[in-house]
Structure formats: structure tokens, C-alpha cells
Amino acid sequence: MPKMAAEKNSKPAKKAKLGQNFLSDASGALKIVEALGDISDATVVEIGPGRGAITDHLAKRAKRLIAVEIDRVLAAQLRLRYSRLENVEILEADILAVELSTVLAQRIGPLRDLRPTKPEKVRIIGNLPYYITSDILLRLFEAHALIDFAVIMVQKEVADRIAAKPGTRDYGLLSATSQLYTHVEKLFTLPPGSFNPAPQVHSTVLKLQMEPKLEALGVDEEGFDSFLKLIFGQKRKTLFNNLRVAYDMAKAREAMKAVGLKSDVRAEAVALEKTAQLYNELRKG
């Protein structure tokens, strides 16, 4: 996974260079937190707390809060701000490099006594940096077994792609992968004025309930993930031409015919269920 690079001696005012626009709408922040539901007995992981607009509400409500912030200055400020709260942990780290299972196993102070007897599923929340949204989502999908659901804010255009249906202009690899692992629900949209500095786009809050469809589709995780990347590899090409990169031409043609797909169809027009059928057909013999 690619990693974000923090600038040395970075200042909060320059955080936008890392793709961060700080949420400044108090009512919007509260609305996002309320989308998590009752978290009095839950562990919440916040991605990119920034100046703490969402964190303030989480700290008062969550049984345990782990806020992951890459910016050294912001992390230090947050650590000082919540130093007296035993349920809050500020982790200065790149979220793309964080192993969720390792973080959850670490208990500090009196929290050591709260270690569960079986793995807990956490709730994720965050205003995701625009330029690494896809990378963060893929990282979360990898850890789907540890996550209950995520409430995330992303660029509206990206939200449209995540929730897009097959056969529509926005449907692609991000749509298929998101819908393979989660049930996607659009909650609400915030205007540019809700942030500082104000971005040039609207932002949409999504709820991603982890509901992996791997077993129902009869596919293996690693293989099918790679298959999706293959068939969406070059959007201008037909599904058949993308398959030719990895499969014999005759085998690809026969498999498509066997599952009822025309040779000129494009991957974005094929439903996830049909894509899984094609994948399994190609695995035969």
C-alpha cells in the first residue's frame, strides 16, 4: 500500500498539502458522529482527526477512541488536549501503514483491564483526504473481519462512484470492490463552506456496513480482488480485451459465452454476481 509522506516541521495551517480540509461546521461534525449510533460500549477508530472537530464528540461518547493522525504537530496538540481522558489514544501514524489488529490488541493504562475475551469489531470514522481515499478504503476492506461499519466523508464525486450501479457512467473498480465488501448508504452532503480551507467540491458522508459477499458469490478474496483489477484495468477496452492480458483468447471467449456475456461488453456493464460467475468459469480446468 502507498504511504502518505508528512513534511518535516509541518504546521496545521499547511495540512492541506496532505489533502486535508478541516471540518469547521459544528452541526455537521455532530451529525457525522451521531451516524455511529450508540458508541458507549464500542471502540472507535478515527482517521485523520485534524483539529478535533469530530474527536471532541467521540471522546465524550466512545468507550475507547483511537485517533490516527499523521501530522506530528496536530498529533501532539491532540495528545495534550485529551491527556486527562483515559479512553482516548492519539496515534501518530500513517493510516495506510497501521495494522488494525495490532492497534486493537494494545491496551494502555486502566484500559488493560478491558481486554475482550474475543476479537472486537470496531467502528471507523473519518474525513478522508481526497487524494488517498481509494487507498484507505482498500486498506479497510482488507481488515473487514475486524470492522463493524465505517462512517466516512469523501469527495461527492468519489461517493457517487462508490455507490454507482452496474451499467452507469460512474461504475468501476472502486464501485465493485466497495460493494463486494460492504453495503453502501449515502447519508448526507456538506458544502465547501463547511471546511477550512474550503475545497472546490462538495463532500458526502457514507455509511459502509461490512457485509462481505465473497462466500455468497463463491469466490476467494485474493484471487477475485486481482480479477476485478484485471477486468477494470483499462476502461476504454472491452471486458474480453482486458481478459486477454492474463488468459488465452479462446478460453476467455468460451468462458464469456458460457455465462451469457457478449464479446463486446465492458466490465462496468456487468453486475458483481455475473462477474463472479465469469471468474469461476475461467478457473475451471
Swiss-Prot record:
Subcellular localization: Cytoplasm
Protein name: Ribosomal RNA small subunit methyltransferase A
Keyword S-adenosyl-L-methionine found: yes
Binding site for S-adenosyl-L-methionine: N21, L23, G48, E69, D94, N127
The enzyme's E.C. designation: 2.1.1.182
PROSITE patterns: RRNA_A_DIMETH, SAM_RNA_A_N6_MT
Catalytic activity: adenosine(1518)/adenosine(1519) in 16S rRNA + 4 S-adenosyl-L-methionine = N(6)-dimethyladenosine(1518)/N(6)-dimethyladenosine(1519) in 16S rRNA + 4 S-adenosyl-L-homocysteine + 4 H(+)
Superkingdom field: Bacteria
Entry keyword annotation includes tRNA-binding: no
SUPFAM superfamilies listed in its UniProt record: S-adenosyl-L-methionine-dependent methyltransferases
Signal peptide positions (record): none
Classification via InterPro entries: KsgA/Erm, rRNA_Ade_diMease-like_C, rRNA_Ade_Mease_Trfase_CS, rRNA_Ade_methylase_Trfase_N, rRNA_adenine_dimethylase, SAM-dependent_MTases_sf
GO CC term, one of those recorded: cytosol
Gene from which the chain derives: rsmA
Record key words, sorted: Cytoplasm, Methyltransferase, RNA-binding, rRNA processing, S-adenosyl-L-methionine, Transferase
Function, in words: Specifically dimethylates two adjacent adenosines (A1518 and A1519) in the loop of a conserved hairpin near the 3'-end of 16S rRNA in the 30S particle. May play a critical role in biogenesis of 30S subunits.
One MF term in the entry's GO annotations: 16S rRNA (adenine(1518)-N(6)/adenine(1519)-N(6))-dimethyltransferase activity
Protein family according to the UniProt entry: Belongs to the class I-like SAM-binding methyltransferase superfamily. rRNA adenine N(6)-methyltransferase family. RsmA subfamily.
HAMAP family registered for this protein in UniProt: 16SrRNA_methyltr_A
